[in-house]
Amino acid sequence: MVVGDVTTSTDVLVIGAGPGGYVAAIRAAQLALDVTLVEKGEYGGACLNRGCIPSKALIHGSKLASEAGQAEELGIYADPTVALDEMINWKDGVVDQLTSGIEQLCTAAGVNLLKGTAEFADENKVRIIHQGEGQGSESLKFENCIIATGSRPIEIPGFGFEDERIVSSDGALNFDTVPDELVIVGAGYIGMELATVYSRLGSDVSVIEMLEQALPSYEEDIASIVRKRAERLGVDFHFGYTADSWAASDGKAVLTAVPADEAAHDSDIELTADRILVAVGRRPVTDTLSIDDAGVETNAQGFIPTDSTCRTNKEHIFAVGDVAGEPMLAHKGSKEGEVAAEVIAGEPAAVDYQALPAAVFTDPEIGTVGLTENEAANKGMTPVTGEFQFQASGRALTANRAEGFVRIIATKETERVIGAQIVGPEASELIAEIAAMIEMGAKLEDIGSTVHTHPTLSEAIMEAAQNAREKAIHRRN
């Protein structure tokens, strides 16, 4: 690669080294394509550096602290002391290990790595602005391009992140001390996961949500289990309110929230906090690409529409991950990255979003895949459902975590599995079994007749499938 006015070329240009981008680059290199990967920050993107991995590290650490302090029922008496700075250092070590691992994987695969930013000059060329030693720029022609620039936290008016008291999820993963009082704006999955972390660590947590339910994208019977557990941890919810403004007072922030619907609430509320976490969603990073110069279309929210092969309106330009729209999940981006690389190499490939699982790492966890019962009915199907409560699971009881249930949805005519929802212990792990079943076109009988190890949480999946067939042993059918 020559730096300067010389124009170089590549078979595949990948912009962004998050879960979608680096996977796309490695897969394309495996398929004998010449690949250049451009990244302006740390390898791994938001997921590895400011999202999935660091948040799960803090979720794990806070879980250990919480369980140690609440195990009297088991005859264990402890009063753990949390050194948040040490927990953050451990978290950062995990991130560093994985970041360096990604760089090594890319290098070993033969991917050409560039540190810098990319701006489209036209639909076949970008300008690379280098960072670090040897700063400069160059033009790079490409046969195909994969845009994987990810997303960033949404700011709301009046709550800019320039003041240290107002933070996004990025900042909330790097507090130097546990806030005595924390206000979270937004009860989606990010807000609820971080409410779980800091309530476990001892913060007085208040959550403001515009709608009348925590986790509003989930069914109420699932969300209510998580909300009730959060309330037992001390989280205070204010539903039907929006954050209006804030003011500094005695070193703290006083937030004013107004009713989202004046018919439901007749007065404003004020909440005092050391930190205010704004967790109202994420927006795509497309505004730095000069994307119009490539002729790539975006929608009103800035996302890049794609088809099932991850193609944009330009046949040789692809988009994967958060920048391509909901659901914004790291593993979705990785799968899309694989598909885009394979399509570029001439292989038949497409993304099956029906078998795409999702997880929320609250307490208890949530895992979902495929259709809900209502979604299936709205598509003209006749769904049949089976459920099994963890209260009847020997393994859940022996883990002292018997909240929640497994629900499986299938078509009545064929008994083909089309969806599932799990709320309970290890839901994020359990949902993968049902995702695999959907991917394979499996039926309820396939799950129900598969012997599951006893005692395990996975037995609940077998029992739920059998319940849908009126053959469950450990519950009424």
UniProtKB/Swiss-Prot annotation:
- Detail which positions bind FAD: 39-47, 56, 118, 322, 330
Q: What would be one Gene Ontology cellular-component term for the protein?
A: cytoplasm
User: Which amino acid positions bind NAD(+), per UniProt?
Assistant: 186-190, 209, 279-282
GO MF terms on file? dihydrolipoyl dehydrogenase (NADH) activity; flavin adenine dinucleotide binding
Required cofactors, per record? Answer: FAD
Database matches in SUPFAM superfamilies: FAD/NAD(P)-binding domain, FAD/NAD-linked reductases, dimerisation (C-terminal) domain
Whether NAD counts among this entry's keywords is yes
Q: Where in the cell is it found?
A: Cytoplasm
Q: Which domain of life is it from?
A: Archaea
Kindly indicate whether the keyword Flavoprotein belongs to this entry. Answer: yes
Q: Which reaction does it catalyse?
A: N(6)-[(R)-dihydrolipoyl]-L-lysyl-[protein] + NAD(+) = N(6)-[(R)-lipoyl]-L-lysyl-[protein] + NADH + H(+)
EC no. given is: 1.8.1.4
Q: What class of enzyme is it?
A: oxidoreductase
Q: Please give the InterPro entries that the UniProt record associates with this protein.
A: Class-I_Pyr_Nuc-Dis_Oxidored, FAD/NAD-bd_sf, FAD/NAD-binding_dom, FAD/NAD-linked_Rdtase_dimer_sf, Lipoamide_DH, Pyr_nuc-diS_OxRdtase, Pyr_nucl-diS_OxRdtase_dimer, Pyr_OxRdtase_I_AS
The further comment given in this record reads: The active site is a redox-active disulfide bond.
Family that this chain belongs to:
Belongs to the class-I pyridine nucleotide-disulfide oxidoreductase family.
Report what the protein is called.
Dihydrolipoyl dehydrogenase 3
Q: Which gene encodes it?
A: lpdA3
